[in-house]
């Protein structure tokens, strides 16, 4: 076993691990970091994603603080661009000698890791400061795990990665799953020339969708957050009705009221394409696929040997139990701004750099679990507003200069106007949320 020494041991070279390490290396010119990942290259789940994947939110707010990604605006970087970007960032920091990356290695606990390529290569790390777990959010994609339903022998079932590799043209397609991956699969099939009638789409639950245009700074400052709708409503349904009327949130089908919210983001053009598919099956989750029938929770639909079934059911971001982010010699990276993992990780690193006391750091960096249901929308919206207000008050200059922060694109005057508006609404919104969902705010 080889012994090595470092200040920080970062487990995972995915988006959150890279954002954390980059911020710390940028702020502290003496810090040393060892980074370990099971993949051969940095980028985490991007290494396993399908070829046609792109960012769902603008590249301007993604990646790390020290390096721009894409040309700016609402540009959506491809998966290949993201992977090349992370390799560039890694190479930059490796050249300084302050970051050492150990690819194709598995962390086994107690500051030890081993090579996945050579069983005789094991390492023990003397960590001078802290061990950082950037894998806790547990991002999964369909290509790295089997489907969670029975599949009979001979059924043509593929992950989205294999759609571009089909050797025989199928008669039709069944896309299973309604999250971001399912939407991407449908959009890919349509873009490649499939007729909408060739596609059946199993949508277990409809979810509210975010309009990507709301990330444009001008529109964001005009619309603000959703606090005004929360304050003025008397029920959760009224909140969602108001957001629907203002088109701050969108629906896949205007005639179906969503029951889920998972931060899925689409453009108006993409939504129009998705609505071309009329063969939407709303019978719950798939239980089993046989050679001629698909069994769902609430019924069955026919299938056939020439049908390609596309598994898009991996829970990309699970709703994990909340843990304190700072605990002695450990840091567990989690979102502190809803659905903004890399921005959260970068700020957590900045808090680690600026503050010495764990209690103060945890007071600023309160974890927000990934939302799943409509009630989660209300909880995460109000808690994000609280966190953002506290963090902005503590370190306003960081927010103005961070490329991962939408505040960076506002300018000072717009930020002040928005901040004043939100500060007035926040106490009322928090009180309303606690009244509507007391069990979620019991602490």
Q: Where is each model-derived feature located?
A:
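Glycine-rich active-site loop/strand segments that organize a redox cofactor
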Residues: 38-88, 160, 202-259
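Beta1/beta-strand and adjacent pyrophosphate-binding region of the FAD-binding site
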Residues: 2-16, 169-179
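Short hydrophobic core segments
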Residues: 9-11, 124-140, 173-176, 304-315
């Amino acid at each position: 076993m080889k012994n090595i020494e470092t200040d920080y041991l970062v487990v995972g070279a995915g988006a959150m691990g890279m954002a954390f390490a980059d911020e710390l290396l940028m702020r502290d010119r003496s810090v040393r970091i060892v980074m370990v990942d099971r993949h051969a290259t940095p980028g985490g789940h991007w290494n396993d994603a399908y070829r046609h994947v792109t960012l769902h939110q603008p590249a301007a707010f993604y990646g790390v603080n020290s390096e721009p990604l894409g040309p700016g605006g609402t540009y959506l970087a491809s998966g290949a661009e993201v992977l090349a970007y992370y390799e560039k960032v890694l190479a930059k920091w490796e050249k300084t000698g302050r970051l050492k990356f150990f690819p194709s290695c598995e962390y086994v606990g107690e500051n030890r890791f081993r090579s996945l390529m050579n069983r005789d290569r094991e390492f023990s790390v003397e960590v001078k400061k802290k061990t950082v777990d950037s894998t806790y959010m547990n991002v999964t994609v369909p290509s790295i795990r089997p489907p969670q339903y029975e599949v009979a022998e001979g059924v043509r079932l593929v992950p989205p990665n294999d759609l571009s590799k089909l050797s025989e043209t199928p008669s039709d397609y069944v896309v299973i799953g309604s999250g971001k991956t399912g939407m991407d699969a449908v959009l890919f099939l349509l873009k490649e020339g499939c007729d909408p009638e060739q596609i059946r789409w199993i949508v277990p639950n409809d979810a509210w969708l975010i309009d990507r245009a709301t990330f444009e700074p001008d529109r964001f400052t005009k619309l603000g957050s959703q606090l005004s709708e929360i304050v003025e409503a008397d029920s959760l349904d009224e909140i969602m009705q108001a957001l629907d009327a203002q088109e701050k949130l969108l629906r896949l089908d205007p005639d179906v009221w969503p029951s889920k919210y998972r931060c899925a983001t689409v453009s108006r053009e993409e939504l129009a394409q998705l609505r071309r598919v009329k063969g939407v099956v709303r019978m719950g989750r798939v239980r089993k696929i046989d050679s001629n029938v698909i069994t769902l929770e609430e019924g069955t639909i026919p299938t056939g040997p020439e049908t390609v079934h596309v598994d898009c059911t991996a829970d990309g971001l699970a709703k994990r139990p909340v843990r304190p982010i700072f605990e002695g010699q450990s840091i567990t990276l989690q979102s502190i701004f809803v659905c903004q993992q890399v921005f959260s990780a970068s700020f957590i690193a900045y808090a680690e750099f600026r503050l010495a006391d764990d209690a103060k750091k945890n007071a600023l960096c309160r974890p927000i679990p990934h939302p799943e249901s409509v009630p989660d929308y209300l909880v995460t919206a109000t808690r994000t507003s609280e966190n953002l207000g506290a963090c902005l008050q503590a370190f306003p200059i960081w927010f103005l200069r961070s490329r991962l922060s939408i505040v960076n694109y506002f300018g000072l005057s717009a930020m002040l106007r928005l901040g004043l508006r939100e500060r007035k609404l926040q106490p009322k919104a928090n009180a309303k949320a606690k009244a509507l969902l007391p069990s979620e705010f019991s602490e």
